[in-house]
């Protein structure tokens, strides 16, 4: 990924697509939103990136774009759990929009301070057709057997409306990109998700999406929900993680991979816990998950970010929740807005430190 960032920073016109897949920490778009804004401030705005094809849950509020739906049915794939069944027709967003009512619409509106989009990409499966409208520019998209289709407006627009025309259409994702160059960061998170949910995504759909999106970096941000599973099998989890790394490398061979180690999180209702009130402590499986993630990353050559350590280590979730200006919610699992900005800034700073070190080594070699 650093090579791609270097080309972009040098004015080479290359775009850098970062794709983060994970759980509620990713779905909320507050941590990824901070990282996106910071990277785009330095390297340029490559667009909002990939979004679910609808409003997947109440309170959905992605940064940089407003999404509204009218008679538009959006379905979240059931969580895989321990069964791990493959969810046919479900791609990396974990969401399907099944349009059975002609005239149903989905509208995406960019923030006014952002560059206008120059390409609209939709991924789905027919036989139904989709109308894509940006003001008075209108296109009709047919997916047939499935895939991703792009349209390029001739003029500047900040709003796009998708309208179902006929028959049944399954839409998997929507992508908005800006002018060539800059960073595009897509946050594809599902509340409650584990790595098994990524494993359950339809292989054919995922292959088509990754071929179209061409990410420079894929970030895996799972682990919290596995850590609250007292029956976690460490060997099975390690095999699953290794398998998903192999899968992503096969489907996106040009992408770098990074694992965000599971952050600190606390469970309520314990005795003699590490929290200030003694009632909370990390679930035992959380350290197991983190150890597997770190060890596998080192073994297979995947970047690893120590989220747990960078937020303060053991029981930091309690300290961050009880500080003068809290950075975490009272559940000691999720970050609030201020905390998301803080930890997103820490991640950005660490990435830039690594990038500068890489640039210095490359300059010395030349």
Predicted feature locations:
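Loop/turn elements at helix/coil->beta-strand transitions in domains of secreted/extracellular proteins
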Residues: 14-17, 181-184, 213-218, 252-257, ...
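Surface-exposed patches in mature extracellular/periplasmic domains of secreted proteins
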Residues: 27, 42-54, 257-260, 306-307, ...
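Active-site beta-loop-alpha junctions enriched in small/polar residues
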Residues: 190, 223, 262-264, 310
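Catalytic His-Asp segment of secreted/periplasmic serine-dependent ester chemistry enzymes
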Residues: 203, 264-366
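Short coil-to-helix leader/linker segments, especially the first N-terminal amphipathic alpha-helix
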Residues: 1-7
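Short hydrophobic beta-strand that contains or immediately precedes a catalytic carboxylate
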Residues: 18-22
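Conserved SGNH/GDSL esterase-like catalytic core that processes O-acyl groups on lipids
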Residues: 25-243, 250, 334
């Amino acid at each position: 990924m650093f090579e791609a960032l270097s080309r972009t920073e040098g004015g080479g016109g290359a775009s850098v697509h970062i794709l983060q897949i994970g759980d509620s920490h990713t779905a909320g778009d507050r941590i990824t939103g901070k990282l996106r804004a910071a990277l785009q401030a330095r390297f340029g705005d490559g667009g909002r990136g990939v979004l679910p094809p609808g409003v997947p849950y109440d309170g959905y509020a992605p940064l940089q774009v407003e999404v509204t739906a009218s008679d538009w049915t959006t379905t979240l794939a059931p969580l895989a759990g321990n069964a791990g069944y493959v969810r046919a027709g479900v791609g990396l967003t974990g969401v399907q929009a099944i349009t059975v009512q002609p005239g149903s619409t989905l509208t995406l509106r960019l923030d006014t301070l952002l560059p206008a989009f120059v390409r609209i990409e939709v991924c789905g499966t027919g036989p139904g057709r989709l109308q894509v409208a940006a003001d008075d520019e209108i296109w009709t998209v047919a997916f047939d057997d499935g895939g991703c289709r792009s349209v390029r407006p001739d003029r500047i627009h900040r709003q796009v409306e998708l309208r179902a025309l006929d028959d049944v259409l399954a839409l998997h994702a929507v992508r908005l990109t800006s002018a060539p160059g800059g960073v595009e960061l897509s946050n594809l998170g599902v509340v409650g998700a584990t790595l098994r949910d990524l494993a359950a995504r339809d292989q054919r759909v995922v292959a088509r999406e990754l071929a179209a999106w061409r990410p420079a970096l894929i970030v895996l941000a799972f682990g919290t929900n596995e850590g609250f599973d007292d029956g976690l099998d460490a060997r099975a989890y390690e095999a699953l993680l290794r398998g998903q790394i192999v899968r992503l490398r096969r489907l996106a061979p040009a992408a770098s991979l990074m694992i965000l180690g599971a952050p600190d999180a606390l469970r309520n209702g314990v005795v003699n816990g590490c929290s200030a009130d003694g009632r909370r402590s990390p679930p035992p499986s959380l350290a197991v998950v983190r150890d597997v993630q770190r060890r596998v990353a080192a073994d297979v050559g995947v970047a690893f970010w120590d989220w747990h350590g960078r937020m303060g280590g053991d029981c930091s979730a309690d300290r961050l929740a009880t500080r003068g200006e809290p950075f975490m919610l009272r559940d000691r699992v999720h970050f609030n807005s201020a905390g998301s900005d803080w930890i997103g800034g820490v991640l950005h700073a660490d990435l830039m430190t690594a990038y500068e070190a890489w640039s210095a080594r490359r300059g010395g070699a030349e």
